[in-house]
Amino acid sequence: MGSQLALKSRIASTASLEKIFNAQEMIASSHIAKARDVALNAKPYTDAIFDAVQALVAHTHIDHPIVKKNEDNPRVAVLALTSDRGMAGPYTSSIIRETESLLARLDEQGKQPELYVYGRRGVTYYKYRNRPVAGTWEGDTDQPGVEVAESISKALLDAYMKPADQGGVSELYIVFTEFVNMVVQKVRVLRMLPVELVLPEQPESGPVPESDADAATPLYAFEPSVDEVLDAILPKYIQSRIHECLLTAAASETASRQNAMHTATDNARSLIDELTRKLNASRQASITQELTEIIGSADALNKKEE
């Protein structure tokens, strides 16, 4: 009887968890379409600014921090985009693992990485381990707004534009999860600054002419000067790229949460079925034992009467 009571208790608690998992899955399912659309809708704007920056970078004669790497400054900024909430499978752990790998590689190269973290789970992880963090942000990782992108981009741009002797950094990396589809989300490391010129794909045969740098992007006329345009467009470029990373990370987080809750719901239902079979087997064994005892008692009475 004690075994049956324990099984009933486990079935009841598992059924309660199954309802929670199923509700979380349905909530994530209702959010994923919007999160995916928001990320896709932001891409054209980001691509347009990226093309403009590429056109500026194509002017190889310019001397601007956006394209010039300070080899004398070993400090490097690394921004990790984690989540505020759990129940999203390996989402945050994958980001932290890739971030730790990047930090180790930078250390091997003789650089001094400075860590910035977005998301309560990541902040808690590094705080618990007493790891130094240069900047943290929390809130709405599954629905990030423009305000948080502005705050992050301002802090990172300030760090990048500072002189080396004032604690500035020479490079900026972002570790985030790129949304591919509902099943696939890839952890990526993006070096945002300094900007490198991306040339169009060339045929395998024949040399690459120098004029191809001018063909990397559409033609632009810059007024009053390339440097002044760079100064004006740099904050918008950083903010738009960070905002795009936040949005695709939010879509990835929601998809990961839906997949995790779907798996948890299936596992809970399988466990309920297994526990129910054990309970039924225990009941059947109890009934069989009781019948055996009754029949044995009846036989004993009959023998006494004889």
From Swiss-Prot:
It holds the Pfam family ATP-synt. Coiled coil: none annotated. Its main location: membrane. The keyword Repressor does not apply. GO terms for biological process: proton motive force-driven plasma membrane ATP synthesis. CDD domains: F1-ATPase_gamma (cd12151). InterPro entries: ATP_synth_F1_ATPase_gsu, ATP_synth_F1_gsu. It is found in: Cell membrane. It is a peripheral membrane protein. One of its GO terms (cellular component) is proton-transporting ATP synthase complex. Keywords: ATP synthesis, Cell membrane, CF(1), Hydrogen ion transport, Ion transport, Membrane, Transport. GO terms for molecular function: ATP binding; proton-transporting ATP synthase activity, rotational mechanism. Belongs to the ATPase gamma chain family. Produces ATP from ADP in the presence of a proton gradient across the membrane. The gamma chain is believed to be important in regulating ATPase activity and the flow of protons through the CF(0) complex. F-type ATPases have 2 components, CF(1) - the catalytic core - and CF(0) - the membrane proton channel. CF(1) has five subunits: alpha(3), beta(3), gamma(1), delta(1), epsilon(1). CF(0) has three main subunits: a, b and c. This is ATP synthase gamma chain. It comes from Bifidobacterium adolescentis (strain ATCC 15703 / DSM 20083 / NCTC 11814 / E194a).
